[in-house]
Amino acid sequence: MEMGIAIKTIGQQIINMVTDLSLSSAPAIHLHINSGGGCAFSGLAGAGHILNSDIPVFTYVEGSAASAATIMSCVGAQRHITEHSFMLIHQISTGVWGTYENLVDEKESMDSLMEMLEGIYLKHTKIKKKQLKDLLKRDLWLNPQKCLELGLVDEIIKYERG
């Protein structure tokens, strides 16, 4: 529940930031992400605003980007991850209480949501459909090199002393 609230808050902040900055002449928006994920719908809203922004949004994974946070990260115009960070993509999770028909409705809704999320990963990364299906079945944290290979990011940021 706490993660869902956090990602919902972050999603709303992104919407506000992109809307505000779209009215300005800023050269780029630099979005730094460290999130355990949360509500898929909020992640989709944030991703939509990133994609619709007139100003390019550069994403930076610092620490972690999991679940809904990866949706926002992978749609950035330029996508970065720091060398000590990880990303996690996985199936959505849900719960339902009620009649058999409530369960049937929830399954139909979740199938539709999963299809939409898969479409975003397939469009904005190098991940192939079968590979994506296999990845989504697991809860594996992907290191920066694997994220680069899969096309979740474009660059690994290395730390260097000054």
Please provide the spans of the model-predicted regions.
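Terminal-region recognition feature
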Residues: 1-162
